Amino acid sequence: IDVVRRLAGGMGEKIYAMTGAWDPKRPTEGAFTALMNFEGGCVANLTYSGYAHFDSDIWMNDVGELGQRKLAGAYGDARRALMALDPDDEARLKTTRTFGSGKTVDAKHNEHFGPVIALCDRADLKLTPDGVEVFGDTERGFIEVTFGPAPRRTVNDALVAAVRQNKAPVQTGAWGLASLEVCHAILQSASTGQPVDLRQQCKTNEEEQTG
């Protein structure tokens, strides 16, 4: 949701969504699909499933979320790791992936948040961990992106700058509230079967550089 809002300018207007709760051991929504429109005419189709069957990292050149190479034969590891755990043990396992866990991954690529394809008027753009694939009118190209800092470091850097330098992050608290509004709107729309108007949306506090 954050990535799509950033690409579309942040100002969502309305969202229509459906959710799925397909695991009786975890009786809550674990998947959704949504159609969201933005100020200026942009429309986004968002789909997520947390049920660990299809691994969309195969669409990201077999690179994991934190930039690590996915190992051959590792399919299903996440589900197998949870099979013998009770809810408390599962919650503790998930904390090992947080900022303060002390664990790192051997990242050789930039981090990503799943497949993103932007369909534009003169080209389609596919985001990858190493750059942007460009599918133009008559040519196809690739814009390489420099390998960035350690996974999640930019988040920590923004926090330090906010506390020590009184510098507002690009995504402020208002931005987080706007993304949270989208999450609640997805649940509301799925429950009522109706589109939901968004009223707490905002832009980032930093203009994108172009040209």
Map each language-model feature to its residues.
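Residue-level detector of beta-strand face positions
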Residues: 33-35, 117, 133
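Proline-centered turn/helix-capping motifs that create local helix->coil transitions or kinks
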Residues: 8, 12, 126-133
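Rossmann-like dinucleotide-binding domain that binds NAD(P)(H)
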Residues: 1-43, 47-111, 174
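Short, solvent-exposed loop/turn segments at secondary-structure junctions
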Residues: 21-23, 50-53, 123-125, 132-133, ...
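C-terminal helix-rich "cap/oligomerization" subdomain common to oxidoreductases
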Residues: 88-102, 106-109, 114-122, 126-129, ...
